[in-house]
Amino acid sequence: MNELNKTPKEIVKELDQYIVGQQAAKKSVAVALRNRYRRLQLEENMQQDITPKNLLMIGPTGVGKTEIARRLAKIVNAPFVKVEATKFTEVGYVGRDVESMVRDLVENAIQIVEKQQYSRVYAQALKKANQRLVKVLVPGIKKEQKQAGGNQFEQMMNMFNMAQQQQEAQEEVTEDIRTNRRTILEQLEKGLLDNREVTIEIEEPKKTMPAMNNGLEQMGIDLNETLGALSPKKKIERTVTVKEAQELLVKEESAKIVNDADIHSEAIRLAESSGIIFIDEIDKITSKSQQNSGEVSREGVQRDILPIVEGSQVNTKYGPLQTDHILFIASGAFHLSKPSDLIPELQGRFPIRVELDDLTADDFVSILTEPNNALIKQYVALIGTENVSVIFTKEAIERLAHIAYDVNRDTDNIGARRLHTILERLLEDLLYEAPDMQMGEITITEAYVNEKLNDIVQNEDLSRYIL
């Protein structure tokens, strides 16, 4: 729970490492997150009455709406899911129902809890995995196996995963084999055998049937688990490096140690208390955006979303989940509509409104250079793998920023995503030729940027198709 104990200023500081500007939005999400921590410090009867203040982010595409929510979830290691409001259909029509967003959130929570539980038992699982691996690398002497002689009971026992126990009983281990196994175990623990190939037997991954499962999952029934319990676990052989084999076996042994029921109950609790659901393109399901359209009205989708945002119980295959304390963050450009076009009940469930600013040329300069793993740092690192060093001059970066701003202004405004298309166009030849170039240093100057991009920028029709 320590990750929740961050002050709003600390949260904003961490968001600043990845997102340029948008201080009002960062401040609002930081306060919403801190309020969760504050609620958990209160008495239990008061906790139940304090619900999250959901946010509505308003701003054009590419200004950081999704990234703010995604980074926020990573900062506190909270279950997070992003959905598009336009993907849902109201009850009675073919398509995804709105409750699927909650089920997706639980799946994400399962992954988080599973990772935490597996790391807790890692040392124990590694020890068991190494023991299995040593037996594969230094096999025992096989005894002569007695024929089953048509004994149906023995054959049935073999089907139900008894073959492993029989194999161990039919192996003879001499003193030399024990000595070799001790030696191999020492080498294994030191990582000296990591690149050696080995053939291991592991359980076959579960096959899922999503198309059949959706309806049953709404009733809290997991068809895959039901069918899996009826059929025996199959083993498959895989030839991998010792390092990869170790990872596969550790995962398998961890699953045996950890109790699935504990993972499921903890994941439900985590999703209920810390889950974040980001609903994108909520402006596309307003009545205003549906005018003169032949599509089914999306107002029904708004009414289906309403009880989930208000707080209701959703059945998942891991158990029922209450949505009362899940934080919902909705976003939309609202070019053709406005927030007041949402149904009044839904408007009231998003009391905090944050308008994100359009990006300026100065913002683009910052985006290219300041964040952790900024775009220019990414391209320099990629080309650096070919032993070619690339340096961007300050003037070149400023010119790139102004080009991105001008193209956004004169064509469609896609925000920071414009920088991706411009950099790809600028570095296209270099990315193609780099493997055949000798080691050296290349400086990207303002003149080089103009040479590569000016003709396209000046021709508005070309800009629309290429940039």
Swiss-Prot record:
Q: Name one GO cellular component term.
A: HslUV protease complex
Tell me one GO biological process term. proteolysis involved in protein catabolic process
UniProt keyword annotation of Nucleotide-binding present: yes
Q: Which domain of life is it from?
A: Bacteria
Instruction: Please give the family membership noted in the entry.
Output: Belongs to the ClpX chaperone family. HslU subfamily.
Outline what the protein does. ATPase subunit of a proteasome-like degradation complex; this subunit has chaperone activity. The binding of ATP and its subsequent hydrolysis by HslU are essential for unfolding of protein substrates subsequently hydrolyzed by HslV. HslU recognizes the N-terminal part of its protein substrates and unfolds these before they are guided to HslV for hydrolysis.
Q: What is this protein called?
A: ATP-dependent protease ATPase subunit HslU
